[in-house]
From Swiss-Prot:
Annotated InterPro entries: Ribosomal_uL3, Ribosomal_uL3_bac/org-type, Ribosomal_uL3_CS, Transl_B-barrel_sf
Record note on modification: Methylated by PrmB.
Biased composition (Polar residues): 130-139
GO molecular function: rRNA binding; structural constituent of ribosome
The name this protein goes by in its record: Large ribosomal subunit protein uL3
Annotated spans, Disordered: 130-151
Length: 211
């Protein structure tokens, strides 16, 4: 059973069931996740497995990174990620593949949402607009009041206002694995997953899977 894998979003398509029902799916390419380090309670204070995936030009790998990957006997990848794992479950140099998943499993997918630049409160937070007429001249899409009075005399941290929309870590839970193609290293997931085509996504077993 896979603890999780790092994949790359390829885009969306659809597959048909035997009854002819169209199912929208996201295609995730999951190359072999190479184990670059196994963290233990004794040396690191917690148990986890560190993986890398893909490749990176030698000129883009620092000496520290090169030594780290060489110690595990794996090729340098485009990044490193961690998954919590029990001791002895994995060893450095081994691989985690898409074969750890099977059709019908429920998974959680984490990615970086598409960046949409600077956005106002209506678009970013789904604020209601103000009156289009009846004396309203310039405040149709304005947020309105952002504070109270002399007390507290300030704007609270985290106040929903205009700002950068998207480009943040998002997790979609309880997506169904429709198909696993071990030959092509593909995972077909029902529905949409966060991020743009070509972006890295983290696929884990669902933490809130319904029994």
């Amino acid at each position: 059973m896979a603890i999780g894998v790092i994949g790359r979003k390829c885009g969306m398509t659809r597959v048909f069931t035997e009854e002819g029902v169209s199912v929208p799916v996201t295609v995730i390419e999951v190359g072999p996740n190479r184990v670059s380090q196994v963290k233990t309670e004794e040396s690191d204070g917690y148990q986890a497995v560190q993986v890398t995936v893909g490749e990176r030009r030698a000129s883009r790998v620092t000496k520290a990174q090169a030594g780290h990957f060489a110690k595990a006997g794996v090729e340098a990848g485009r990044g490193v990620w961690e998954f919590r794992a029990e001791a002895g479950e994995f060893e450095a140099g081994s691989s985690v593949t898409v074969e750890g998943f099977e059709a019908g499993q429920m998974i959680d997918v984490t990615g970086t949402s598409k960046g949409k630049g600077f956005a106002g409160g209506v678009k970013r937070w789904n604020f209601s607009t103000q009156d289009a007429t009846h004396g309203n001249s310039l405040s149709h899409r304005a947020p309105g009041s952002i504070g109270q009075n002399q007390t507290p005399g300030r704007v609270f941290k985290g106040k929903k206002m205009a700002g950068h929309l998207g480009a943040e870590r998002v997790t979609v839970q309880n997506l169904e694995v429709v198909r696993v193609d071990a030959d092509k290293n593909l995972l077909l997931v029902k529905g949409a997953v966060p991020g743009a085509t070509g972006g890295d996504v983290i696929v884990r077993l669902a933490v809130k899977a319904k029994a």
